[in-house]
A protein has these predicted regions:
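Charge-biased low-complexity segments
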Residues: 1-126
Length: 126
């Protein structure tokens, strides 16, 4: 007898039929508008909350790249926050800021809520 399982693996923001809706982005109707609004709100939060002086305090120079990935789960909560950077301190700061993101309307595929992965590159120029 065949086994039926549900694929619960996170989907990419660009591959779901309905993207997660950041608070304040409900007014936009198209997927592209909602992606842009989502990205704008995330970027604004990072600009406001990320401690940009941290790199200088650590004696880092030049351009520092931090790659953050998180999942907006089926309930619209931010989970599985992970960052990658040469600096442990910058990685921790990026993860801290990503966890500040508010709950939102979850992404959907075929009308059903799904987990959606979002990747965010942060560039800190010192």
């Amino acid at each position: 007898m065949p086994t039926i399982t549900i694929d619960d693996s996170p989907r990419n923001l660009n591959t779901v039929s309905e993207v997660p809706v950041f608070p304040g982005c409900e007014k936009y109707a198209t997927k592209q508008e909602r992606i842009e609004c989502f990205s704008d709100h995330v970027a604004k939060l990072v600009h406001r909350k990320f401690d940009g002086s941290l790199g200088s305090e650590l004696g880092l120079q030049g351009e520092q790249r931090i790659y953050v990935q998180f999942t907006v789960n089926k309930n619209g909560d931010i989970i599985d926050v992970k960052a990658n950077s040469k600096s442990k301190e910058l990685r921790k700061e990026a993860e801290r800021v990503a966890r500040l993101l508010p709950s939102m309307m979850p992404g959907k595929q075929n009308g059903q809520p799904v987990n959606v992965v979002y990747s965010l590159p942060i560039v800190l120029k010192l």
